[in-house]
Amino acid sequence: MPEFILGARGHDFGRHDPETLFSSIGQAGFACTQLAFTKAVEGVKSYADVTPALVERARTAAAASGVGIAVDGTYVELSYADEDKRHAEAAKVLSQIPVARALGAGCMGSETTNMAKQPGVTRREAQEALLRSLGEILPACEEQGVLFAVECVYYHAMNTPEAVRMVLDTMASPNLRVICDFANYVGPEAASVDAQRRIWDKVGSWYGDKITAVHFKGQNFQPDGTLYSTSLEDSCVD
């Protein structure tokens, strides 16, 4: 049985300097975190603000607090069909690979792209763009010994277990992993327990060994299918 280490997202604690952020996470009883500099660290508005000095402060603060960095969150738009936009987003990830390595992060992580952000683009086109982005990112990750994980979301480009398996099989990279947020697989049409179990069976049997981080959150759906957040107790997620 694999050992699970309980953590929390850094930006759920608000924006702070690295020392305050990691101290707060550790004092809350968590052993690791998902650190997204652009969401959790004061003064960071873009990846250009993630300087070597700031990275060293974060590394030192993490070590002092006993909080590991499980995921270096580099959440960008990997599935833009517009090549100029897509290439710019992939470049952001490439700039952060040395950061993840310096931090000793378990992996880097990103979702793909919300389909609503590019009307008129088909999911197949968005997935092909995702593969092109990963084709730029993964060779650099392999060279520098960093894992890169993608996260499935049912309204994004990579939206089903079938899509995840396609990406893993197509890229065939030893450094490609999966972040699994169970809630993100569940749309209103698959909210029943039986439907969810069919999803979980696919996730576990097809690529369970590729899952490097798991997220938990609560959600449910209004009668019209509108998504809303809940506690874990009130969640429709089985």
Report the location of each language-model feature:
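Acidic/histidine-rich catalytic cores of soluble enzymes
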Residues: 33, 125, 132-236
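A short, Lys/Arg-enriched amphipathic alpha-helix followed by its capping loop at the start of a domain
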Residues: 2-6, 24-30
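Short acidic/polar active-site loop segments enriched in Thr and Asp
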Residues: 31, 68, 106, 212
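Boundary/entry segment of secreted carbohydrate-active catalytic domains
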Residues: 1-16
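Active-site acidic/histidine proton-transfer and metal-coordination neighborhood
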Residues: 19-20, 24, 56-57, 61-65, ...
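Glycine-rich, proline-tolerant flexible connector loops at the mouths of alpha/beta enzymes
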Residues: 34-59, 112-119
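Active-site-proximal loop/turn and secondary-structure-junction residues that shape catalytic pockets
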Residues: 12-14, 37-39, 75-78, 112-117, ...
